[in-house]
Amino acid sequence: MAAIYLSRGFFSREPICPFEEKTKVERMVEDYLASGYQDSVTFDDVAVDFTPEEWALLDTTEKYLYRDVMLENYMNLASVEWEIQPRTKRSSLQQGFLKNQIFSGIQMTRGYSGWKLCDCKNCGEVFREQFCLKTHMRVQNGGNTSEGNCYGKDTLSVHKEASTGQELSKFNPCGKVFTLTPGLAVHLEVLNARQPYKCKECGKGFKYFASLDNHMGIHTDEKLCEFQEYGRAVTASSHLKQCVAVHTGKKSKKTKKCGKSFTNFSQLYAPVKTHKGEKSFECKECGRSFRNSSCLNDHIQIHTGIKPHKCTYCGKAFTRSTQLTEHVRTHTGIKPYECKECGQAFAQYSGLSIHIRSHSGKKPYQCKECGKAFTTSTSLIQHTRIHTGEKPYECVECGKTFITSSRRSKHLKTHSGEKPFVCKICGKAFLYSSRLNVHLRTHTGEKPFVCKECGKAFAVSSRLSRHERIHTGEKPYECKDMSVTI
């Protein structure tokens, strides 16, 4: 075997192992490298072999360390030896792989077992499957896909150096040469774990050549597939199939649940998720259904009365942590959601969403009884209880019932006498934060609610609503005894 002159410093490197104390593998490797090989170093000199029993004694970190050190040694020695080979040897080595053992080494690595190996005659690049080679040749030679060879397990070329008997193994994608089959196997494993297909234009790496091929269309504007109907060109055949489907109206993908058809699988997946999202978790108390168990568990707390999330300011408890977070903002005054139209801020995003509809005038939820429209579905539900007379929320203190839970909550404070919201200017206390906000406008003079008809401004929205009835002539309140509207 040809010997290569290498100094000890060639192998100097930072410690791989995170331990302060060197492991037995690291010490063994350093012993090999520091044992006086000043004249020459061969592959056998730096190779550390373990018996199966010895290998079983190593932990995971030591095995990875062994792999890293051996890989570096193999790559360093191989690259140096490759450079000093005579030109005649180099040309003969470029013809293919050596020995059937090389194929066994490739099978040891992840991602290469069971495939044919195909190489390009022009650049020598190796591909795992023939279609990858054809795609590569199409890009390189403008459509000619004949300049390539494919090798199976039984057709790997065998070459022996008659003069020295030396056998070198070359893996074409990166040009590395190895004397030992295990060195090639370890090298292939690391190479496969990375992204071996690099774009020559921008340097971006890809795990599969097909991905690189599609990416190259960005730089070259190359359109390999063309739709004959109107001449549109696309970069991949899959895009062409979807393009044809759009113009022909062909919908080949069908969901089994409802029979609806789609042009591609991405469109098919959306309704499947809808079918999977059926509300299958049902509350045994009230029969209401939910999409998942977590929503059902939150709902059950309404029936049990458990409220684990407590406000540190006023002691109010909530069933969900999100409700507590929104409630705390009533104490801190934080309103992170601001309207871009008028600048009004809100403590909750839902409040901002509802407010935005006031600018557009959109009221998508309409009462079937009286035709009145609302901006939110909850407002419509609460309104329908006026017609039905339903009041599901009862006060545990006095038995009074309410249409909404918020009205019951406000009512409960009348029993406790608690007024947690205090004006910092005059010290007046209020039961509700909304009333404190209205009160503060008496100090600031702010009147944010403006009539669109006459321009008159009001501090409270309810007063604006009452004023607007002067212009519209609306009289929503009817006396049942006298049949008079007010």
Curated annotation (Swiss-Prot):
CDD domains: KRAB_A-box
Keyword DNA-binding: yes
Cellular location(s): Nucleus
GO MF entry, a single one: RNA polymerase II cis-regulatory region sequence-specific DNA binding
Main location group: nucleus
Entry GO terms, CC: nucleus
ZnF region ranges: C2H2-type: 118-140, 169-191, 197-219, 223-247, 253-275, 281-303, 309-331, 337-359, 365-387, 393-415, 421-443, 449-471
Top-level taxonomic group: Eukaryota
GO biological process entries: regulation of transcription by RNA polymerase II
Pfam family, one: zf-C2H2
SMART domains linked to this entry: KRAB, ZnF_C2H2
Keywords per UniProt: DNA-binding, Isopeptide bond, Metal-binding, Nucleus, Repeat, Transcription, Transcription regulation, Ubl conjugation, Zinc, Zinc-finger
Cross-link (Glycyl lysine isopeptide (Lys-Gly) (interchain with G-Cter in SUMO2)): K273, K424
Domain annotation KRAB: ranges: 41-112
Keyword Ribosomal protein listed: no
Function per UniProt: May be involved in transcriptional regulation.
PANTHER family named in the record: ZINC FINGER PROTEIN, ZINC FINGER PROTEIN 672-RELATED
Family, as annotated: Belongs to the krueppel C2H2-type zinc-finger protein family.
Protein name: Zinc finger protein 561
